């Protein structure tokens, strides 16, 4: 919250699968102050257009009109919800409150967008970012394109807080197939439960592959200059791993 007052967006929440998943199979690393999961985004082109090319680079007048239309829609929904709430039971009221909380966040972002409307974004070159790569066919290119978008977020100071869940290991997400596609191994979830002889070598190969992607991110951060030096020198980065075996840390 402290950092968000200086940027266009409070945070950027990314993953390879998008959404929030569910309690034991989350697909986001971000939660709000109430513990509610923040939906993650995973389609590169949509991410780019939403955060770095609002309204497809439309003129300011058109973008202002779009913001005002969005605010009107939010106001109408909020007004209707007040009438609806009086007719709901206690459980449904709780669900509605969750929805209204999300709607308030939308309204807050619309107001933020309006405040930043006349402030130009820093110049950047996105020509080398692949916005159309598919995680099911080119995992490395996909992961690195997401990292490129993260760096762009820091470089333009669009946000100062970003999370990225590279892969779920529950056997359900795109990332579960990464070791199959890039290394010819079993699925991520299968490897994590494997007790056969030699399975640690498979774990090691997969961990090394992820470490290489992280190294790519670190190197690009190091070579991207900020006002006070490299992005790497001015950023706190936390890189975490999955369980070592079955459900054990």
Regions flagged by a language model, labelled:
Residues 1-249:
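Ligand-binding pockets and gating/stacking loops
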């Amino acid at each position: 919250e402290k950092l968000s007052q200086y940027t266009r967006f409070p945070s950027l929440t990314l993953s390879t699968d998008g959404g929030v998943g569910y309690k034991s199979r989350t697909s986001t690393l971000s939660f709000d102050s109430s513990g509610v999961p923040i939906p993650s985004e995973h389609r590169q082109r949509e991410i780019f257009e939403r955060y770095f090319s609002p309204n497809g680079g439309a003129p300011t007048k058109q973008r202002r009109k779009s913001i005002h239309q969005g605010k009107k829609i939010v106001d109408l929904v909020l007004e209707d919800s007040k009438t609806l709430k009086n007719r709901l039971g206690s459980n449904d009221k709780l669900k509605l409150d969750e929805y209204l909380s999300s709607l308030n966040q939308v309204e807050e972002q619309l107001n933020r967008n309006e405040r930043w409307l006349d402030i130009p974004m820093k110049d950047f070159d996105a020509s080398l970012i692949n916005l159309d790569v598919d995680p099911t066919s080119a995992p490395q290119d996909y992961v690195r394109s997401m990292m490129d978008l993260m760096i762009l977020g820091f470089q333009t100071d669009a946000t100062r807080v970003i999370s990225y869940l590279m892969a779920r290991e529950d056997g359900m997400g795109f990332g579960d197939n990464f070791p199959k596609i890039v290394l010819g191994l079993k699925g991520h979830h299968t490897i994590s439960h494997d007790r056969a002889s030699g399975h640690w070598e498979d774990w090691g190969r997969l961990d090394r592959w992820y470490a290489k992607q992280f190294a790519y991110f670190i190197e690009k951060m190091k070579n991207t200059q900020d006002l006070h030096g490299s992005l790497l020198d001015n950023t706190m980065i936390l890189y975490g791993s999955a369980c070592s075996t079955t459900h054990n840390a």
